[in-house]
Amino acid sequence: MKKFSILLILFIGFINAQKLTPAEISLINQGDINSALPIYQTTDAHQHTTLLNLSTEINPKDPNTAVLVKRMKESLLSTDGGVGIAAPQVGINRKVIWVQRFDKAGEPLEYFINPVITWRSELQNLGPEGDLSIPDFRDQFYRSKVIQLEYVDLKGQKFSEMVEGFTAVIFQHEIDHLFGILISDKKKKEENDSYQAVDAFKKSDSVTR
């Protein structure tokens, strides 16, 4: 009985955690709900902070989630060549993304709720990336060539699939957003890690000589 009570409390806590806050609901429904939501920019201090925050799961069956999904698509379509967008980029720190599926016929845009990468290949590719939230920034990044992905749709149905190539890169980029990871910061970290590795090698080399 005690074990059941603990599980029930955990379940209720999980459900409550997925509930949107009044502020989130207000933002999602502001203005014309059929229009695009503004895309947050790192050049704005408040918006930048939102982009750096961790995102939490969302209730896929909440009617407001459907509105968010729809408006995020409009936001992506309003850009010049954007291939993906994450909820933090429209001010909502929840786990929702849109990705253009270059691995499918017609290259459709598809949404993904509470996406999780459960596996990444060790084999990586180096390729260019930009970001709708970071003006005038583009650089080369390493990403896993293949990933295993799990997610749900608006009905709460669970899916799992393997994705590879450029589409896998987009997924990794957008899911990074859900963890508050921006490619500008990612580049700084990679450069710092590279510097530390080289510096450590030089120190080690000087000792052995």
In which residue ranges do the predicted regions lie?
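Positively charged
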Residues: 17-209
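Sec-dependent N-terminal signal peptides
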Residues: 4-13
